[in-house]
Amino acid sequence: MTTKLSVNLNKVALVRNTRHLGIPSVTRAATLCLQAGANGITVHPRPDERHIRTDDVRDLALLMQAWPDREFNIEGNPLHNLMDVVHGLVEKKLPVHQVTFVPDSEGQFTSDHGWNFPGDASRLRPLIAQAHAWGLRVSLFMDADPAAMAGAQAVGADRVELYTEPYAAAWGTAQQTPQLARFAETARAALKLGLGVNAGHDLNRDNLSAFIQAVPGVAEVSIGHALIADALELGYSATVQAYLRCIAQGRS
């Protein structure tokens, strides 16, 4: 099984939004990443549009029409603005392949926890059904908790995205091995229930290979902050290729 790399472009938009010049270009960044071999593009449009804006989502969807073998993943809280943003693309028959539901509060600094079951089940079930009616795959942002995977499966999710910040924070410490073991156990629980496994948050060139090697069945990693930071030094193409090598190392 090959683990796919989806590049999150939020930080490109964040830099662009500090001026009114349109640079750096989000669509240019996407093009360079796709040309370098990235398997997909991820964005997380927040209600305050502090980085990715609704226009960016449309422009990227238009761009993705030229890359039919790659995927467009849109993250966000379906209780806020996500469903409206996605519906706008669906109405125009623009490509979007996966929605990742994230339980962020409005104005939250960054994603920092997953959905809770059974507490969130009644709110999520109709939203997942709506996304499925639009022909989209649904992934739920989840903490590494094997017992919670049954809840994700019960509400109709297709995949879970494991929130990897606890692993990243433990990297290089005595907690690294226990964290990897917990993520591996969670992935096995998800796979046993027929869920696909994605992962993301603070994965980087240092910790990615070990994660891929230890955690079974990871279909996709979504990486933004570290990858864009590396691209400031190395360029988009070299950076994407470096991350693809990390994935290949983890799979070897």
Swiss-Prot record:
Natural source organism: Albidiferax ferrireducens (strain ATCC BAA-621 / DSM 15236 / T118)
Family named by the database record: Belongs to the PNP synthase family.
Q: Which residues does the UniProt site feature Transition state stabilizer point to?
A: E161
Disulphide bridges, residue numbers: none
What role does this protein play?
Answer: Catalyzes the complicated ring closure reaction between the two acyclic compounds 1-deoxy-D-xylulose-5-phosphate (DXP) and 3-amino-2-oxopropyl phosphate (1-amino-acetone-3-phosphate or AAP) to form pyridoxine 5'-phosphate (PNP) and inorganic phosphate.
Residues annotated as binding 1-deoxy-D-xylulose 5-phosphate:
R46, H51, T110
SUPFAM superfamilies given in the database record: Pyridoxine 5'-phosphate synthase
Q: What gene codes for this chain?
A: pdxJ
Q: What is this protein called?
A: Pyridoxine 5'-phosphate synthase
Check the record and name the Pfam families matching this protein. PdxJ (PF03740)
Q: Which UniProt keywords apply?
A: Cytoplasm, Pyridoxine biosynthesis, Transferase
Q: What is its main location?
A: cytoplasm
Detail which positions bind 3-amino-2-oxopropyl phosphate. N8, R19, D202, G224, H225
The protein's location, in the record's own words, is: Cytoplasm
Tell me the domain of life.
Bacteria
**GO molecular function: any one?**
pyridoxine 5'-phosphate synthase activity
Query: How is the quaternary structure described?
Result: Homooctamer; tetramer of dimers.
Enzyme class of the recorded protein, top EC level = transferase
Cite the annotated pathway.
Cofactor biosynthesis; pyridoxine 5'-phosphate biosynthesis; pyridoxine 5'-phosphate from D-erythrose 4-phosphate: step 5/5
Cite the EC number: 2.6.99.2
Which catalytic reaction applies to this protein? Answer: 3-amino-2-oxopropyl phosphate + 1-deoxy-D-xylulose 5-phosphate = pyridoxine 5'-phosphate + phosphate + 2 H2O + H(+)
User: Mind telling me which GO cellular component terms the entry cites?
Assistant: cytosol
**Active-site residues, as the UniProt record annotates them:** H44 (proton acceptor), E75 (proton acceptor), H201 (proton donor)
The record's section on PANTHER family has: PYRIDOXINE 5'-PHOSPHATE SYNTHASE
The record's annotation in InterPro entries points to: Aldolase_TIM, PyrdxlP_synth_PdxJ, Pyridoxine-5'_phos_synth
Does this entry carry the keyword Protein transport? no
Which BP terms does GO give this entry? pyridoxine biosynthetic process
